[in-house]
Amino acid sequence: MIIGIGSDICDIRRIETVLERHGERFLSRVFTTAERAKAERRNGRMRMGTYAKRFAAKEACAKALGTGFAGGVFMSDLGVVNLSSGQPTLRLTGGAAARLSAMTPSGMGAQVLLTMTDEYPYAYAQVVISAVPLPTSLIGGRGLP
């Protein structure tokens, strides 16, 4: 069952401009260490596209959470990570994780699906948050208090 959906488009040139003006301050406030490491392994437009896709993913996730960046949800609470298959997803911490927990129905788990793409000068991301049944071994006194 879908419980949240969000999308965002980001102008890569905007990220370039913000980085020129604010550099490290912007990077440390918006991106996780892992996101920064991934982007810094790339050059030129690929590096900017990597940052812009992750920026768009954070915006899309905030929309899917239904709060935007309010109610204790901050950009630093959202980090793009890759599953072992290479598929991107988001790791939520802090206020974002609390909001995700609050919006997930009892007895269900949350699944965060993410897709990202870029074609200069734009980056795009879409997030779908689904509530999925927990394995029965975790429900009803067989694993959960």
UniProtKB/Swiss-Prot annotation:
EC number(s) from the headed UniProt entry: 2.7.8.7
GO MF annotation: an example: magnesium ion binding
Enzyme class: transferase
Cellular component GO terms, alphabetical: cytoplasm
Domain of life: Bacteria
Predominant cellular place of this UniProt entry's protein: cytoplasm
Cell compartment(s), UniProt: Cytoplasm
Record key words, sorted: Cytoplasm, Fatty acid biosynthesis, Fatty acid metabolism, Lipid biosynthesis, Lipid metabolism, Magnesium, Metal-binding, Transferase
InterPro entries per record: 4-PPantetheinyl_Trfase_dom (IPR008278), 4-PPantetheinyl_Trfase_dom_sf (IPR037143), ACPS (IPR002582), Ppantetheine-prot_Trfase_dom (IPR004568)
Reaction catalysis annotation: apo-[ACP] + CoA = holo-[ACP] + adenosine 3',5'-bisphosphate + H(+)
Pfam families, sorted: ACPS
Cofactor(s) the protein needs: Mg(2+)
GO biological process, one term: fatty acid biosynthetic process
Binding residues for Mg(2+): D8, E59
Matching HAMAP family: AcpS
Entry similarity comment: Belongs to the P-Pant transferase superfamily. AcpS family.
Function: Transfers the 4'-phosphopantetheine moiety from coenzyme A to a Ser of acyl-carrier-protein.
Protein name: Holo-[acyl-carrier-protein] synthase
Natural source organism: Granulibacter bethesdensis (strain ATCC BAA-1260 / CGDNIH1)
